Regions:
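Nucleotide-activated sugar donor-binding and catalytic core shared by glycosyltransferases
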Residues: 1-222
């Protein structure tokens, strides 16, 4: 007799359980600026995001780019990259707020991504233009954000497929594609909100794996 029972992916529960009390980052929750977050980025993704920012800013001057590198040992490298671009930068570890003339906020602290997503309007999830398989797209989806990733999503193929099918996740291969999509969201807030809501709905519909798994374990142990 088969004892195989299928439950949902526990990652949906982990994203649903993100601390709802975490809200705000450096006062950006009170800002009217549009915020594009590059979360868990690797080389060359910061370069792609900086190119995107420079192109979109011509049409959306209030846009703020927030970069959250995956590895702390790259903080200084990314800071030099931003400086070289000529854009005005703030580094979070030494800031209490973000001025209106700041172009790029570099989050040079660990453990801040969840808070950063609460002040974002759009998100790019890293490790996906860089060939790292892609990081967790459910984290921004839990904050009702429209999500972009590169083509490398093999770490979480089912999750990414569900988000893409729902209209919440969009694949961008380069700065040109990222620019086009970001600009469309800047111009059409309703479309961005709809995409974000679609991702949140996927998350809600697929949660409960942990509860189901524990019930199955309990059943087989009795």
């Amino acid at each position: 007799e088969s004892k195989l029972t299928l439950t949902n992916n526990i990652k949906f529960d982990q994203a649903s359980a993100l601390d709802a009390s975490v809200s705000g980052f450096l006062g950006l929750e009170h800002s009217s600026r549009k915020v594009l977050v590059g979360g868990s980025t690797h080389d060359p993704e910061e370069t792609v995001l900086l190119q995107t920012y420079q192109a979109v800013k011509k049409h959306c001057p209030q846009l703020l780019l927030v970069l959250v590198p995956r590895h702390p040992e790259r903080f200084e490298t990314v800071a030099r990259l931003i400086h070289k671009s000529g854009l005005a930068m703030t580094q979070s570890a030494s800031a209490n707020s973000v001025s209106d003339d700041c172009d790029v906020l570099l989050v040079n602290e660990m453990g801040k991504l969840n808070a950063v997503y609460t002040v974002a309007d759009f998100a790019f999830v890293g490790g996906s233009i860089a060939d790292r398989g892609g990081h967790n797209a459910l984290e921004p989806a839990a904050r009702k954000l429209p999500v972009m990733m590169g083509p490398n999503t093999y770490n979480n193929p089912v999750i990414c497929a569900k988000l893409a099918e729902s209209g919440a996740l969009f694949i961008v291969e380069d700065a040109a594609a990222m620019t086009e999509l970001t600009l469309s969201w800047c111009k059409n807030a309703d479309a961005a909100a709809l995409a974000g809501l679609a991702g949140y709905t996927v998350l809600e519909q697929n949660s409960g794996a942990l509860d189901k798994t524990m019930k199955v374990v309990e059943l087989y142990n009795n």
